[in-house]
């Protein structure tokens, strides 16, 4: 498993939103973003920025009660999931892997809030941990997870 991390200081909501816009502009279709952080840490703000980066015109709101919001008006579909109200065993019954596998829905970007409640994870994803620290504001730690083999450049 390939794993590195990048920490970004986000002084306010605007900075969190801008990070989301950058992600939305640069991530390819098929990307999965797992978001973790306390209430009010900026998960939904980040997803709203991703939507803006994808040129989605609709208002992006947290799907806390609907569980899944689908936005298809942008250049790539965005599937926004919120697992806050669910237990891990409930999550498996939703078959949300259909979203990252592109089964029954067009391939898009999948953003999952409260990802710690997710049982089975995709093979490749960005794990973003959002924390709030008194002095620094929000911190986003971005960890790309890749189940891929490294190429041995020494082997001919």
Predicted region positions:
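N-terminal pre-Walker A segment at the start of P-loop NTPase domains
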Residues: 2-22
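Short phosphate-coordinating micro-motif centered on Lys-Gly-acidic
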Residues: 4-6, 97-156
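Conserved post-Walker A coupling segment in P-loop NTPases
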Residues: 31, 57-61
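Hydrophobic anchor at the beta1->P-loop junction of P-loop NTPases
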Residues: 33-35
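Walker A (P-loop) phosphate-binding loop of P-loop NTPases
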Residues: 40
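Conserved lysine of the Walker
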Residues: 43
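Conserved nucleotide-sensing/catalytic segment adjacent to the nucleotide-binding pocket
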Residues: 61, 70-114
